[in-house]
Amino acid sequence: MNESYQPTLIEQLAQEYWEENETFEVKEDLSREKFYCLSMLPYPSGDLHMGHVRNYTIGDVIARYQIHKGRNVLQPMGWDAFGLPAENAAIQRELPPAEWTRKNIKKMRKQLKQLGFAYDWSREITTCDSTYYRWEQWLFLQLYKKGLAYKKNAIVNWDPVDQTVLANEQIVDGRGWRSGAVVERREISQWFLKITDYSEELLKDLDELKEWPEQVITMQRNWIGQSQGVIINFNLEKGPDKLQVYTTRPDTLMGVTYLAIAPEHPLAKERAKKSKKIAAFLKKCKQTRVAEADIATQEKEGIDSGLFAVHPLSKEKLPIWIANFVLMEYASGVVMAVPAHDERDHEFALKYDLPLKPVIEPADGHDWDYNQAAYTNPGKLINSGSFNDIDSKTAFNVIADYLKNNGAGSRQTHYRLRDWGISRQRYWGTPIPIIYCKTCGTVPVPENQLPVLLPEDIIPTGHGSPLKETASFYKTRCPVCNKPATRETDTMDTFVESSWYYARYSCPDQDKVMLDDRAKYWTPVDQYIGGIEHAVMHLLYARFMHKILRDLGLLNSNEPFIRLLTQGMVLKDGAKMSKSKGNVVTPQSLIKKYGADTVRLFIIFAAPPEQDLEWSDSGVEGAYRFLKKLWGFSYRIKDALLAINQQKERSNYQWEAPEHRQTRQQIHECLQQANIDMERLQFNTVVSAVMKILNILIKLTTDNDAEAHLIREGTGILLRLLSPITPHISHHLWQSLGFGGDILDTPWPRPDPKALQTTELELIVQINGKLRGRIQVPTEASKEIIESTALNQENVQRHLADKKIKKVIVVPKKLINIVV
């Protein structure tokens, strides 16, 4: 053991030890309790950033802690390697995405290993490898057979110059990020997964997720968006057709003054053929972004279709407007507008001089100016004929029943959740295993022809679809009739890859089936760690896919992740670290200067995992100083500990002196609190406990036999508490001080109940119920000793002067009250 702390050397030695001994390679063992710890897999951008390091350090602390607790721990790592960023980088660098991606993976794998994470690298997966995505294609075929994968027209952002579909984030001020062309809304045929078939179960099973953050549960609940409402039929004034409207407010039905339909509604398209004005309006609507949030915040615009519908109750004529705020994807693409009781409808009605008809007044009877604002709260019905004077809640049921009995409507449970559109008109993704034949139609690729390989030598230009221009890919033969046919050139949304990867880690070497029985052993994941930005997309899709895999008999649990931790962001100068802000601190530079353990210690100590972490250079320096202090202390006590650790009776030492028992009590109290905090994932306060223990131990001397044994016990506790957080220095010191071989083979420390037993108690002394002092007495002191000690306390004596004591009441182990 060197006198000075040399992190680069000891970290290299520890990492070599773990690799040579395959320390973190695990096998299934039914005799042991398993623990599956997983951090969200990274996109291989080429460089780890501090957000990565924080995420993975938190996960590693949990995994190593569970190893110490004797569990069979799996902590794997892999790469979410497909997707748009790689395609964009390839366009800029003029090289294939495959080449760029694999180079980045190699670089990032090295960076992760430098941080000493306890990963089972034998299970590494890369989602752009055909050995991975062939099973995704197999899964797609199973969904297709069950009717859970289907194709329909849907609206996308279309760049007319680059002839490609754009993601919302690729649009800047309404224009394509590369071409600068005005983006259009275009309807194209796309593949969907029927997640809506699982809406009810996805919602219900949120109640099972007792160890997920409430915020994530709420976000998913809102995203699924269950509502109880009514489908109402509005017959067109002319002809047999009708419009169906879904509403959660049937109590406002008598206040409908117009209907609004989506620009993509068949009725709107039909009217555009007969009206240039309507055609021009629909063309303008095509230049609106597809995102629901953008549509909600844009200026409300519309045009009168010239058509009328008939109110199902009053039989009044209602004008039908085409409006840019109505979504074709929501319900039936038709809205019943009640401007007196809906803010958006109110805004639109005022703009186009449409009538307002109040049908609900405040329950307390106070006046409301409906021209100024919509009244959106519950109340009492007015201007509603036979429904007048009914309260809103009752009116919901009364009107719903009336509509049902008269064939004009029906109750319906509705979900905001839409089917998952997985088609991407991009190159760098999993090919969808479908063939189109002029004779046989849509034909799934036979399972024995999987995988449909993605050509990896393509250099995308950003114009059009590279796969549509690659004849060697799309030209094929129909597996049914053997005539010339074409492959599907859309690829899958990368969220598909990340929706089942956690299960594949259990059996990445399996080439006969998607998942084998090892997946049933390891899943569900016991602890999942990742950012809250994935609350509704990734986490919802993974929950959906888990239920699919369960229904296919591949898994035997309902949910993929038992416990979820959403770590906070890493901030510098109050803002999230980013290259654009110029506030990035690179992990590599810090590891080189201070070592990985210092980086890990700072990240864990600076803030609780779920809170944002404010970067502090002085905090990093402080972490480094602490590790140097620990090293210096260990070097000083090395010889004494080596000698004690060779003794057979070292663990049965009895401390007799009160001061030594008190010191031992302090150490075990720190340990007791650290164990509570470890279970609560409050790792920053575990570090605080470690620092307290070191400060206690430094004051002791190895020249005194009792204190030397205290140092040995305390150091053994300290190193194990630090082991998950700063594994390299803990590993090295454990061996150098003679505690044994691998620190990970030792059980997690538990406080000694005897050490926690106090020898003295503090009692409150009251006179006539008022606090007058505090006394220290032996734990088992008699009533007489307690009384005597209290009456001799200086402040008590002062308050008793010239007073007559009537009685003394002793409440055991709490207080003594002197009545005068």
UniProtKB/Swiss-Prot annotation:
A motif ('KMSKS' region) lies at residues 576-580. CDD domains: Anticodon_Ia_Leu_BEm, LeuRS_core. It is found in: Cytoplasm. One of its GO terms (cellular component) is cytosol. GO terms for molecular function: aminoacyl-tRNA deacylase activity; ATP binding; leucine-tRNA ligase activity. It catalyses: tRNA(Leu) + L-leucine + ATP = L-leucyl-tRNA(Leu) + AMP + diphosphate. Gene3D superfamilies: 3.10.20.590, HUPs (3.40.50.620), Isoleucyl-tRNA Synthetase, Domain 1 (1.10.730.10), Valyl/Leucyl/Isoleucyl-tRNA synthetase, editing domain (3.90.740.10). The keyword Nuclease does not apply. It comes from Coxiella burnetii (strain RSA 493 / Nine Mile phase I). This is Leucine--tRNA ligase. SUPFAM superfamilies: Anticodon-binding domain of a subclass of class I aminoacyl-tRNA synthetases, Nucleotidylyl transferase, ValRS/IleRS/LeuRS editing domain. PROSITE patterns: AA_TRNA_LIGASE_I (PS00178). It is an enzyme of class 6 (ligase). Keywords: Aminoacyl-tRNA synthetase, ATP-binding, Cytoplasm, Ligase, Nucleotide-binding, Protein biosynthesis. Belongs to the class-I aminoacyl-tRNA synthetase family. Its main location: cytoplasm. GO terms for biological process: leucyl-tRNA aminoacylation. It comes from the Bacteria. Its EC number is 6.1.1.4. InterPro entries: aa-tRNA-synth_I_CS, aa-tRNA-synth_Ia, Leu-tRNA-ligase, Leu_tRNA-synth_edit, M/V/L/I-tRNA-synth_anticd-bd, Methionyl/Leucyl_tRNA_Synth, Rossmann-like_a/b/a_fold, tRNAsynth_Ia_anticodon-bd. ATP binds at residue 579. HAMAP family: Leu_tRNA_synth_B (MF_00049_B). A motif ('HIGH' region) lies at residues 42-52. The keyword Nucleotide-binding applies.
